[in-house]
């Protein structure tokens, strides 16, 4: 830019400009600012062109529809409620390729969850169209009660305020809708579920089965409203569950005893659930959420001769029986045989509830998971854990089949827990999922047992077939703990020829802080992985 000689003198010195020079300089400043603005606009335009062209070259545009579908499936998981459905539809609005990929992935459309406001005559065809996009894949429908503890039918005349479970669109869907694999129902009371059964009708047309009749999986959650305590008839043919379809997977949420029996849980011993034996005999998977006193669990399990997976949620309540209970005496004298059962999962169970193992015999058991309540130190010292567990395993003769042992919140003293694992030598997977855990003492004890194996051939081998160790929600920021685990695993390699992986879900230590231990483990054939934690607490 040409600059006047007089202005050049001012710009190259520290002299103050005259009024005339000030006016001239200000004029030059405005010209320069204008040119800068033009250049900025040109730069922004060029940057936008660059982004467009780089976007056109992006590998994302060349992803096959199958890969896009896999990515979409990871971003919208589970049974899709209104928010999940909106997220899936938004993916299809990005571009034509994404829309084709989302519509072409049948499993994205295989489930839907609605409440009564989203399940009506207007939306019925939309629900059917959504599920039909899944092609021949198994379909899941969930009817989610808005308020699980309340329904209008409790306080009003049903003619004026109909029960939520008498929803015409719901009845139509279960009667003439698309074939369903799984149905999830959340009802505010057993009376509401009876209303649904009455509207569906008990007698199936064998020549024309309804979606209700051909269900393979049913999850039924029953709450108990204040005005509807449990008053089911004792006669089996009049049972609430008598007309359930012949599913192979049942997830049953029994009402909480405190609400179902007006604060007197012992009344649960005088009633019968009366789940039909023909239904229980056909189950391969059975999940039961029940805190009732009495032998209700045994009464149902005695018919589950084909069950393969059993999950029992005790809701933090201890098992209590009558002293003269016939089933308790029967299965104490001769354990209940469940020949095909390979997976047991006890949830929210007091440690004394492991006594349920005293009644069972499972020769095919492969996977055992215990999710326990937390206890004080005094409680732990008095708790009996090993005896019923090990007696159960011995009576079942499943030492050779039991492969996976998952313990959550079982904060036993370190010595007891180490001894329990020592008595299960054929485990291939051990998962310790504890928030409060004396890890240093435990792993030092495990290392002691492993070291003793090498020095004394007569002692039981310490996890000689271990292939996967998971320490979930257990911090590994303590280098001493890491070293203790590493010493055990390295000693274990001397008697274990199988590849082994150590997985953690809680890592606060830097990689450098434990780099040496991890390198030594890798040299011994043990890989280290940090995995996501899926626990909500």
What would you call each of these model-derived segments?
Residues 1-537:
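Leucine-rich repeat
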């Amino acid at each position: 830019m040409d600059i006047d000689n007089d202005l050049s003198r001012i710009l190259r010195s520290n002299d103050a400009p005259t009024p005339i020079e000030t006016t001239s300089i200000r004029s030059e400043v405005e010209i320069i600012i204008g040119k800068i603005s033009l250049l900025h606009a040109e730069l922004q335009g060029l940057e936008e062109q660059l982004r467009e062209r780089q976007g056109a070259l992006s590998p994302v545009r060349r992803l096959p529809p199958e890969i896009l579908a896999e990515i979409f499936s990871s971003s919208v998981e589970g049974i899709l409620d209104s928010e999940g459905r909106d997220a899936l539809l938004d993916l299809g609005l990005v571009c034509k390729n994404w829309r084709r990929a989302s519509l072409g992935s049948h499993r994205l459309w295989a489930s839907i969850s609605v409440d009564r406001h989203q399940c009506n005559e207007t939306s019925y065809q939309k629900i059917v169209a959504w599920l039909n996009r899944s092609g021949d894949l198994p379909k899941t429908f969930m009817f989610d009660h808005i308020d699980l503890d309340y329904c209008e039918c409790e306080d009003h005349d049903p003619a004026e305020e109909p029960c939520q479970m008498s929803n015409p669109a719901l009845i139509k869907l279960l009667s003439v809708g698309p074939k369903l694999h799984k149905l999830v129902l959340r009802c505010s009371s057993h009376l509401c579920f009876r209303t649904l059964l009455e509207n569906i009708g008990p007698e199936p047309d064998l020549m024309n089965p309804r979606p209700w009749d051909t269900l393979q999986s049913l999850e039924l959650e029953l709450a108990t409203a204040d005005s509807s305590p449990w008053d089911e008839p004792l006669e089996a043919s009049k049972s609430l569950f008598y007309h359930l379809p012949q599913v192979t997977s049942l997830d049953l949420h029994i009402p909480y005893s405190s609400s179902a029996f007006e604060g007197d849980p012992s009344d649960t011993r005088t009633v019968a659930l009366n789940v039909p034996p023909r239904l229980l005999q056909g189950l391969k998977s059975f999940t039961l959420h029940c805190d009732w006193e009495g032998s209700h669990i045994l009464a149902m399990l005695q018919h589950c001769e084909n069950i393969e997976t059993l999950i029992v949620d005790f809701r933090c309540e201890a098992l209590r029986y009558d002293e003269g209970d016939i089933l308790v005496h029967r299965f104490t004298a001769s354990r209940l045989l469940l020949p095909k059962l390979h997976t047991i999962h006890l949830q929210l169970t007091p440690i004394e509830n492991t006594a349920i193992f005293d009644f069972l015999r499972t020769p095919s058991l492969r996977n055992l998971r215990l999710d326990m309540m937390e206890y004080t130190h005094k409680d732990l010292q008095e708790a009996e854990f090993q005896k019923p567990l090990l007696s159960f395993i011995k009576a079942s003769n499943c030492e050779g089949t039991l492969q996976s042992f998952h313990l959550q919140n079982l904060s036993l003293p370190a010595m007891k827990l180490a001894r329990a694992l020592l008595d299960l030598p054929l485990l291939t997977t051990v998962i310790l999922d504890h928030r409060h855990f004396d890890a240093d003492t435990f792993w030092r004890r495990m290392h002691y047992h492993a070291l003793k194996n090498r020095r004394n051939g007569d002692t039981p081998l310490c996890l000689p077939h271990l292939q996967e160790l998971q320490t979930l929600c257990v911090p590994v920021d303590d280098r001493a703990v890491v070293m203790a685990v590493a010493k055990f695993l390295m000693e274990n390699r001397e008697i274990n020829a199988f590849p082994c992986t150590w997985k953690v879900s809680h890592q606060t230590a830097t990689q450098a802080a434990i780099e040496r231990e991890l390198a030594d483990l890798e040299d011994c054939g043990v890989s280290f992985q940090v995995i996501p934690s899926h626990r909500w607490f």
